[in-house]
Curated annotation (Swiss-Prot):
NCBIfam families referenced in this protein's UniProt entry, alphabetically: PRK05738.2-4
GO biological process: translation
Family statement drawn from the similarity comment of this UniProt entry: Belongs to the universal ribosomal protein uL23 family.
Full protein name: Large ribosomal subunit protein uL23
Organism lineage string: Bacteria, Pseudomonadati, Pseudomonadota, Alphaproteobacteria, Rickettsiales
Domain of life: Bacteria
InterPro entries per the UniProt record, alphabetical: Nucleotide-bd_a/b_plait_sf, Ribosomal_uL23-like, Ribosomal_uL23/eL15/eS24_sf
Amino acid sequence: MSVYKYYDLIKKPIITEKTTSISEQNKYTFYVNKFAKKLTIKKAIEAIFKVKVKKVNILNIQGKKKRFKGIIGTQINQKKAIVTLEKDHNIDYAGGIK
């Protein structure tokens, strides 16, 4: 698979207070495509960020029910991946930002 297809797999990193605190343990969190498997997520992270992945955990997040002007709808379902890296590797999210 080319690197461009991997960019379709990994949607965006999740940057919150909680994910920042677990990044000290070499764990990084991403929203991924809902059809992605653990092995393809591992290959995508290794190809995009050039790091060595130790483990991948996946969570399926059910969309919440919301009401807007009396109409009940739901938010989209999402898939979250928590990626654990090897000891000497890390990911710099703001590497290209100046």
